[in-house]
């Protein structure tokens, strides 16, 4: 929800938070560390150009999840030089319209290579695949060794988003 008032953003976040709690779902807010702290969301996801992880940790303290966007093993290594996130959001899997200035497409081979390098360097931070993922991609992506997937357009653009989400959950 870019470009909306802080009041509308907080009102919407609180509504989503209630739904997440009703379904025992984790509520991660993109980029807005102060909103996460104010409403007590579960955590924040920080993009490459967002607040540094260490600064977010100082503001939030322990007990909040902090995720970090990466597109390569080099990004992972660079991130770990200054801070340790709770997970890496890694992608894009394929082209997606939900993100401008898209990084190079990873596909399953990219995920396998990144996870292989992480194992080689004894890095055990969860990887969440993101970017252009559809329901049919999930088995192959999970077989690469990722720990989870993030979906947006494939759910929101479905004719029946609730049924689509139920179908996705049945694959996990």
Regions found by a protein language model. Name each.
Residues 1-8, 12-17, 22-31, 37-43, ...:
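Conserved alpha/beta-domain cores
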Residues 48-58, 89-102, 138-171:
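Glycine-rich phosphate-binding active-site loops on the catalytic face of alpha/beta enzymes
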Residues 4, 8-11, 44-48, 68, ...:
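Alpha-helix N-cap and loop-to-helix initiation/capping positions
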Residues 43, 47, 61, 67, ...:
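Glycine-centered flexibility sites
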